[in-house]
């Protein structure tokens, strides 16, 4: 849902305190056709920046936005030289100088079957031949399951479906001045019964999670930090600089260990799917051992394997 323009998140010095430093980034090749998302790679580090690019509507998403978001995140997932994804929103709004990470689904094109493809921004431009979508949930799962650390940089509004996206990210850094958190689902007859609510309760506890959803109040970055849903609060102009510092520290560590750690943290809440992801990475580790090589080679050479050099650890 688009947050009210008159509420906090507006900046009178929006351009001068923009946390995006163009000199630190280059556009990723092959994505020149993006309209609702921007996709950059850091000039030095193994970090990419993915940003919502509809600041005039508080970075609300439509189906086309989600298509592009999934496409770039999946590209980052499959890029072996990428370790960290920074997920944020471009701004400020050209209308009023307001800032937003993402304010959720664009209610103007929400139909009975979900958010609908449209040639414009109003109900009369909807393509009735195409079914509505709720595939922002697929993006949530992609963020959750991708073997990269995803850091959400909340530089303004995180509302509705945007609030749920911040929740599902591995880490969240927020702008001291402009970050505002608001779960608007119940205001518009919607609800996130998955990660957006259940995982939020893991972060802040059941009581605070229910407060956030049932009351739909607006919270500052400091309040969410105190609750446990935000890792750190930064000055707005320094938000992406701090995000890059965190990313550099993460990228300085073992890629395999970071993957195993992410899936280990997810395992308890993700059930059999979480077990499969963790086990898959464990299998990859096993393939790297001499013991696994012996098993493969013995099969290909049609001989009994010789396990004698390999200890049975306890």
Swiss-Prot record:
Pathway: Quinol/quinone metabolism; 1,4-dihydroxy-2-naphthoate biosynthesis; 1,4-dihydroxy-2-naphthoate from chorismate: step 6/7; Quinol/quinone metabolism; menaquinone biosynthesis. SUPFAM superfamilies: ClpP/crotonase (SSF52096). It comes from the Bacteria. It catalyses: 2-succinylbenzoyl-CoA + H(+) = 1,4-dihydroxy-2-naphthoyl-CoA + H2O. Changing residue 185 to G/N: Loss of DHNA-CoA synthase activity. One of its GO terms (biological process) is protein hexamerization. One of its GO terms (cellular component) is plasma membrane. The record marks 115, 185, 287 as: Important for catalysis. Its EC number is 4.1.3.36. Substrate binds at residues 58, 95, 103-107, 115, 157-161, 184, 190, 287, 302. Keywords: Lyase, Menaquinone biosynthesis. Pfam families: ECH_1 (PF00378). The keyword Lyase applies. Changing residue 133 to A: Loss of DHNA-CoA synthase activity. One of its GO terms (molecular function) is 1,4-dihydroxy-2-naphthoyl-CoA synthase activity. Belongs to the enoyl-CoA hydratase/isomerase family. MenB subfamily. Homohexamer. Dimer of a homotrimer. Converts o-succinylbenzoyl-CoA (OSB-CoA) to 1,4-dihydroxy-2-naphthoyl-CoA (DHNA-CoA). This is 1,4-dihydroxy-2-naphthoyl-CoA synthase. The lineage of its organism: Bacteria, Bacillati, Actinomycetota, Actinomycetes, Mycobacteriales.
């Amino acid at each position: 849902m688009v947050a009210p323009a008159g509420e906090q998140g507006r900046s009178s010095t929006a351009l001068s305190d923009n946390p995006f430093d163009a000199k630190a980034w280059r556009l990723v090749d092959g994505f020149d056709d993006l309209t609702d998302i921007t996709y950059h790679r850091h000039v030095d580090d193994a970090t990419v920046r993915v940003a919502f690019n509809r600041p005039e509507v508080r970075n609300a998403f439509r189906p086309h936005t989600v298509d592009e978001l999934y496409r770039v995140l999946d590209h980052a997932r499959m890029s072996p030289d990428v370790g960290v994804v920074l997920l944020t929103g471009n701004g400020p709004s050209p209308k009023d100088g307001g800032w937003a990470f993402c304010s959720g689904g664009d209610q103007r094109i929400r139909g009975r079957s979900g958010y609908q493809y449209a040639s414009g921004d109003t109900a009369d431009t909807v393509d009735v031949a195409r079914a509505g979508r709720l595939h922002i949930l697929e993006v949530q799962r992609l963020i959750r399951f991708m073997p990269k650390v995803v850091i959400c940089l909340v530089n303004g509004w995180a509302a509705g479906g945007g609030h749920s996206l911040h929740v599902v990210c591995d880490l969240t850094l927020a702008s001291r001045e402009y970050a505002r958190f608001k779960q608007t689902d119940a205001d518009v007859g919607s609800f996130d019964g998955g990660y957006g609510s259940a995982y939020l309760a893991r972060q802040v506890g059941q009581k605070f999670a229910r407060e956030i959803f049932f009351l739909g109040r607006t919270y500052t970055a400091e309040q969410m930090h105190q609750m446990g849903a935000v890792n750190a609060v930064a000055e707005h102009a320094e938000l992406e600089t701090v995000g890059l510092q965190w990313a550099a520290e993460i990228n300085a560590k073992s890629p395999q260990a970071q993957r195993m750690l992410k899936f280990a943290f997810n395992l308890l809440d993700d059930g059999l799917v979480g077990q499969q992801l963790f086990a898959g990475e464990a299998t990859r580790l096993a393939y790297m051992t001499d013991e696994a090589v012996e098993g493969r080679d013995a099969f290909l050479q049609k001989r009994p394997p010789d396990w004698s050099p390999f200890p049975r650890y306890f």
